């Protein structure tokens, strides 16, 4: 997911997407402990997508405060 796509999302969509990705990350981490993953790099991309989403959320919080 690119930053431009993320910035186009509404605030509630950002929150929903973060929750969805965190659930997927949890499931993949759990499965990686018990079996080999088909796409081990998916964990990295999910982690980075979560970071991008949270960065945009924080930028919006700071912009709302007037910083």
From Swiss-Prot:
Family annotation (Pfam families): Ribosomal_L29
Keyword Cell membrane: no
A Gene Ontology molecular function term of the record: structural constituent of ribosome
UniProt keywords, alphabetically: Ribonucleoprotein, Ribosomal protein
Bilayer-crossing regions: none
GO biological process, alphabetically ordered: translation
GO cellular component: a single term: cytosolic large ribosomal subunit
Family matches, as InterPro entries: Ribosomal_protein_uL29 (IPR050063), Ribosomal_uL29 (IPR001854), Ribosomal_uL29_sf (IPR036049)
Homology family: Belongs to the universal ribosomal protein uL29 family.
Protein name, as recorded: Large ribosomal subunit protein uL29
């Amino acid at each position: 997911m690119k930053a431009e796509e993320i910035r186009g999302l509404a605030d509630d969509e950002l929150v929903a997407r973060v929750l969805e990705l965190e659930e997927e990350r949890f499931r993949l981490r759990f499965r990686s402990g018990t079996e080999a993953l088909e796409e081990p790099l998916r964990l990295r991309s999910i982690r980075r997508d979560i970071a991008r989403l949270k960065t945009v959320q924080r930028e919006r919080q700071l912009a709302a405060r007037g910083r």
